[in-house]
């Protein structure tokens, strides 16, 4: 179904302002992940859990940053206004018309994203840390190793407060924090500086924002460019990046639910 649609004009950022917004997101995440998290490892149940708390705070800050930037643009925070300024709208075709059939592109994008995450991202990460070994994940940081230990699995069973923390972290990661900042705020405002390559610049910035987990920078730049930014740019809808990125949240939610129910012991 096609409808006439006027894609609203949003202010365009200079390269300097884009980098300032990027730094406002990347800087706190790096500090929380590498300094605050380790400092609180004892009282928060170990380094992986302390980093989880710290990164969650950083992602919540990114949502606050989105609101600050919207307010500074001078518009209202009413949904009817915000949804247009953040591209939280139905997809738009090349003729500038709302075309709900374009939602079907989500199916192959989600499949490709899953294949990339399960079969390719590990290879990309290995290549990246071979090229830059100082970016390798410290063993004490590994959430996978933490979750794999029998002691941790036993402690997680029935720990619904921790399950809620994971849900909050994932929601702010792939919906209203990280993803909304990069695909809702930055991407619509980068064409003035980067032209038709705005989606690529957005994905590269997304990858190199991950100073809190630099072992994943290259992989995040690849999926951030091709799977999140490019479809969001083509269809003028940040929902594409949000939904595709949230596939990993759904996957991890089911894994965690199994741990909470003690099914993995």
Q: Can you name each region flagged by the protein language model?
A:
Residues 1-114, 118, 126, 131, ...:
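N-terminal, membrane-interfacial amphipathic/helix-forming hydrophobic leader that caps
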Residues 2-9, 41-52, 140-151, 166-169, ...:
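Hydrophobic alpha-helical transmembrane segments
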Residues 34-38, 121-126, 179, 183-184, ...:
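Short helix-terminus and kink motifs of transmembrane alpha helices
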Residues 83-91, 136-144, 197:
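Juxtamembrane inter-helical linkers in multi-pass membrane proteins
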Residues 112-116, 145-265:
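Transmembrane helix-loop-helix hairpins at the membrane interface
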Residues 123-153:
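Membrane-interface interhelical loops and short interface/amphipathic helices
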């Amino acid at each position: 179904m096609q409808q006439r649609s006027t894609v609203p004009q949003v202010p365009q950022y200079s390269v300097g302002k884009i980098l300032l917004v990027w730094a406002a997101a990347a800087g706190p995440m790096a500090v929380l992940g590498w300094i605050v998290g380790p400092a609180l490892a004892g009282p928060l149940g170990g380094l992986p859990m302390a980093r989880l708390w710290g990164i969650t705070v950083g992602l919540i800050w990114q949502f606050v940053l989105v609101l600050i930037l919207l307010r500074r643009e001078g518009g209202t925070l009413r949904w009817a206004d915000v949804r247009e300024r953040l591209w939280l709208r139905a997809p738009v075709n090349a003729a500038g018309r709302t075309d709900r059939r374009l939602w079907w592109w989500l199916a192959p994008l989600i499949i490709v994203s899953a294949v990339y995450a399960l079969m390719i991202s590990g290879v990309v990460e290995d290549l990246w840390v071979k090229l830059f070994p100082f970016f390798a994940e410290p063993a004490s940081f590994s959430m996978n190793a933490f979750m794999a230990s029998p002691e941790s699995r036993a402690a997680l069973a029935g720990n619904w407060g921790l399950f809620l923390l994971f849900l909050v972290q994932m929601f702010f990661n792939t919906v209203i924090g990280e993803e909304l900042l990069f695909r809702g705020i930055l991407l619509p405002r980068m064409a003035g500086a980067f032209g038709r390559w705005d989606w690529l610049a957005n994905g590269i910035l997304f990858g190199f924002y991950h100073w809190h987990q630099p072992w994943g920078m290259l992989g995040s730049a690849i999926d951030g460019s091709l799977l999140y930014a490019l479809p969001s740019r083509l269809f003028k809808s940040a929902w594409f990046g949000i939904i595709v990125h949230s596939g990993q949240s759904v996957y991890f939610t089911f894994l965690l639910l199994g741990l909470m129910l003690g099914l993995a012991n």
